[in-house]
Structure formats: structure tokens, C-alpha cells
């Protein structure tokens, strides 16, 4: 069985741990039954997820050979772990013939990942906002075609644990209120294609001020985006950066060429995936 899952960009600035979107950048996972599994195979996130599914449903997990055709860069803030989890759950649900409802699979994915901002958009496609503290509640929307997206992928990795450790444990009430308001506005701006609303709602107080120091060239790249009337966010935990522009903005197409940066950055133009994960065959 082959399962295809899109990469994602989470947070979108103020939407920390609750908002994300999917792109047409895919990992394809190949699942085959086998008689022998190495210890390395047993410890993979994909197989651990399959085991989780079978244990939750009082079944014994099959032995599997799992290979990946990977196009989503690892440890770059693009939801590579979410692709592993979603692929394994889709496989297990189909292979076991249990055919559990989508809501249950999404709850499993969030329990395994610990937060919904990558696993939900990877599974569902589009733009997703979700809450998990009192049961999983989410809303999916399609992103306006008035935007275009440039992903800046660095030549250095960012460990999620390190990025999470950088975030402060306490925040001022004013900053919390600002983030709540702006995350709502960003979701709406992405739906209706309002670039002005997006730009005016992009400031985050929870994670970007603390994570940006871990990303070389951040301030320079942010300034380039601002000068070209675009918005730049740290994608997930980093190190990748997501630039959102008006679809008619021609200047942004070459704005990140020939950069005199410390790190090497690759600019990739991406389209939104509105369909999410699915079984190829």
C-alpha cells in the first residue's frame, strides 16, 4: 500500500500550536507485510504509530517493511513527523479493515504528535485551526487564491526540542490578548485573501521573538519580505521560513535571489494542497 501525505507549515505567526496549512510537497510511504523486522524498523515513528493504532483497538500489529520517497525536508519545520504519523494511521485503518471515522484518526494523530497544527492540515489539507485541551475541535478552510507562497529552506536543521525550549513559560496578559486577536484575523485574512489584514496581524509574541535568534539571517530575510510588501513567518519550529505575498506581486519572485547570507537558502514556490493525505494504491 502507498500513502501520500503533504508537508505543512504550522503556526503562521500568532497561531502557535493551533494553526497550520498544507502544501503540494509530498512524502510517499510504501507499506509491505514482511516476516522479519529489524530493531531499527521497529523503532521508526511510522511503525510505532501502526502499533499505537492496533493496541488502541486490541489487535496485534503486523510485521511491516516501510520505505519512504521523501520530498519533505526533515527537521526544517515542514511537518515531516506529521507525514509519518498520518501515513501510518491511514495505512493501519485500511489494512485492519476497521474503517474508523476520520475524527478518531485525527484524535490519534494529535495524541501521538502532542499538538494538532501539523497533523491536521497534513491529513485534511487546506488551512486548519484546532484546539485539543478539551477534546479535539477543528475547522478547515480553503486558502484564497489571491496569495502566493515562497518557502525558504535553509541548509541547517532545527531540532524541535531546542526550538520549544526557547519559548518562554510565562507571557504578559497584553501579549496573550494580542496573539488571540491576531490569530483570528490571520485565519480570516487567509480565507478571504486580504493581504493588508494579513500584514497588520502578523506580529507574534509567543514564539517568534525567541526562536528567531536560532535562525541565521532571520532579520535580513524578514526585512526583504517587508520591503516587498510580503509577510514572513517561521515555519513550524524552523529553520524554514514561509513568505506569503499577493498573487500579483512580481518583485517577490526574485527578491531572495543571490543573497549575501551566512546560511544557504533555497527559495521554493509552493501551491496549497486542499485535499490532504490519501491512499495512492
Which residues does each predicted region cover?
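ATP-binding N-lobe of GHMP and related small-molecule kinases
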Residues: 1-76, 90, 94, 98-100, ...
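A short glycine/serine-rich beta->alpha loop
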Residues: 9, 35-40, 70-79, 107-116, ...
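Short, conserved charged micro-motifs
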Residues: 36-40, 160, 248-254
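DPxDG-like acidic metal-binding loop motif
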Residues: 78-101, 123-128
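Alpha/beta catalytic cores of group-transfer enzymes, especially the acyltransferase/condensing modules
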Residues: 102-146, 232
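Active-site rim beta-loop-alpha module in soluble metabolic enzymes
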Residues: 151-212
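Glycine-rich, charge-dense phosphate/pyrophosphate-binding loop(s)
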Residues: 190-281
Amino acid at each position: 500500500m502507498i500513502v501520500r501525505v503533504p508537508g505543512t507549515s504550522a503556526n503562521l505567526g500568532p497561531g502557535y500550536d493551533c494553526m497550520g496549512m498544507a502544501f503540494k510537497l509530498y512524502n510517499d510511504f510504501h507499506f509491505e507485510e514482511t516476516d522479519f523486522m529489524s530493531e531499527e524498523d521497529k523503532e521508526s515513528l511510522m511503525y510505532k504509530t501502526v502499533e499505537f493504532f492496533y493496541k488502541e483497538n486490541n489487535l496485534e500489529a503486523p510485521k511491516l517493511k516501510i520505505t519512504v520517497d521523501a520530498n519533505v525536508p526533515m527537521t526544517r519545520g515542514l511537518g515531516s513527523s506529521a507525514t509519518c504519523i498520518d501515513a501510518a494511521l491511514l495505512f493501519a485503518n485500511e489494512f485492519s479493515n476497521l474503517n474508523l471515522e476520520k475524527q478518531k484518526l485525527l484524535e490519534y494523530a494529535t495524541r501521538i504528535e502532542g499538538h494538532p497544527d501539523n497533523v491536521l492540515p497534513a491529513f485534511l489539507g487546506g488551512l486548519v485551526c484546532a484546539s485539543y485541551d478539551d477534546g479535539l475541535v477543528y475547522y478547515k478552510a480553503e486558502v484564497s487564491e489571491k496569495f502566493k507562497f515562497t518557502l525558504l529552506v535553509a541548509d541547517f536543521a532545527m531540532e524541535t526540542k531546542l526550538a520549544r525550549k526557547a519559548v518562554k513559560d510565562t507571557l504578559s496578559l497584553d501579549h496573550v490578548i494580542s496573539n488571540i486577536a491576531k490569530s483570528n484575523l490571520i485565519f480570516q485574512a487567509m480565507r478571504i485573501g486580504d493581504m493588508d489584514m494579513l500584514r497588520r496581524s502578523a506580529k507574534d509574541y509567543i514564539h517568534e521573538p525567541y526562536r528567531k535568534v536560532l535562525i541565521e539571517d532571520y532579520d535580513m530575510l524578514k526585512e526583504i519580505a517587508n520591503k516587498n510588501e510580503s509577510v514572513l513567518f517561521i515555519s513550524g519550529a524552523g529553520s524554514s521560513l514561509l513568505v506569503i505575498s499577493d498573487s500579483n506581486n512580481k518583485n517577490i519572485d526574485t527578491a531572495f535571489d543571490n543573497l549575501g547570507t551566512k546560511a544557504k537558502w533555497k527559495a521554493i514556490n509552493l501551491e496549497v494542497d486542499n485535499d490532504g493525505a490519501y491512499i495512492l494504491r
